[in-house]
């Protein structure tokens, strides 16, 4: 059994702006929704059987209480935002399992679902369909992998190390050091990708760094790590069989 976990928020953005590139003068009111439905439907037609889709029902989450600069819904175009809830409804009507997240984020749902699915010995592989670097922390060997639909790459644990210079278990630390502009936190000044990887490979997680490595920025780095660490405890399902797609009657 292969479990497919889809970042519905990313897919909606992808199709919305993909349509705009083709027709910049018009935003079809349900164009992105139709695009996502076609994408997920194609997965079923090509053999996918167990599918879950995570969406951000609201953009804000518990992380906004931890850090005031964390991403919000500000700046999301009304024409795009208007398609979030219709997408959730349409996917459910098509027979797909949908997780519309409120207190947690869609990324937390994907991480939790991957954790739950991987615990079932019947599951051969878990594919997380998103290019979001946050989700690289969920990769486990060749069994839980990240699929970047944009590039077509399937990233296993070795692929994560090749891309970031550290293993999946250190991705939250890596992001804490280099920052993540899409999520709204800056990282530690003067630490780029290569320096972050070097420090993490030398010392291990941020908690193990000697005090003088980060100095006055240590507390911020630990906070950013908390922001970057995905939750894996969302009670999304009890049995992976619940993810099996069934054609609506």
Predicted regions and their residues:
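Conserved SAM-binding loop
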Residues: 128
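Noncatalytic, basic helical substrate-engagement surface that gates or grips nucleic-acid strands
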Residues: 1-125, 135-154, 222-223, 229-237, ...
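Non-catalytic nucleic-acid-binding/docking modules located in mid-to-C-terminal regions
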Residues: 47-52, 122, 151-249
